Amino acid sequence: MASIGLFYGTDTGNTEQVAEKVKSLIQEIKPDIRVDLIEIYQRKAADMAQYDFLIIGQPTWYDGELQGDWEEFIPEFEAIDFTGKQLAFFGLGDQYGYAAYFCDAIGVYADMAENQGGTLHGFTSALDYEHDFSKAQRADQFVGLCLDIDNQDDLTDARINQWIPEVLTSFGL
């Protein structure tokens, strides 16, 4: 049975709620896939390294800051050899209040994962957003799913519902 490590960090609970939706949808689409929902707080590299399929959820705080638990996890993350591992990212941000830093956190971590041999999946269009800049953006695409529940919460479920089947297909699951 395939398993996915779904790691997230949260301070307000918003990223956790999205992670729970992601897990629920995966299990609805592919009941034979085990999804382990894991908060990143006080985790070690080995907790993440055991998975071949990873979905990582991160909010971006203020002026492009990483959520505290993800900031602390950087040394652990840098110790992981992602060769052969498949990763997809989702991020939460505010495209208006912090337009110059929209969903930067997933860009920072996606770059590290790719530089450490990981394969990224789940790129999404950046064209339906009104931000100025994002470290998560490459040309007209984000390196994952960017969600703005502050300003576009009405689009969140539809975006997740479109993204998850694409990620599972891209993962080969």
List each language-model region with its residue ranges.
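Residue-level signal for beta-strand positions within conserved beta-sheet cores that form or flank
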Residues: 2, 31-33, 83
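N-terminal beta1-alpha1 ligand-phosphate binding loop
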Residues: 3-25
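A structural signal for isolated positions on well-ordered beta-strands in alpha/beta enzyme cores
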Residues: 5, 34-36, 88, 121
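Short acidic/polar alpha-helix capping motifs at helix-coil junctions
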Residues: 8, 38-41, 73-76
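Short, surface-exposed acidic/glycine-rich loop or hinge patches that mediate macromolecular interfaces
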Residues: 9-13, 42, 60
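FMN-binding flavodoxin-like domain, especially the glycine-rich phosphate-binding loop
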Residues: 29, 50-173
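A short beta-strand-loop structural module common to alpha/beta enzyme folds
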Residues: 31-44
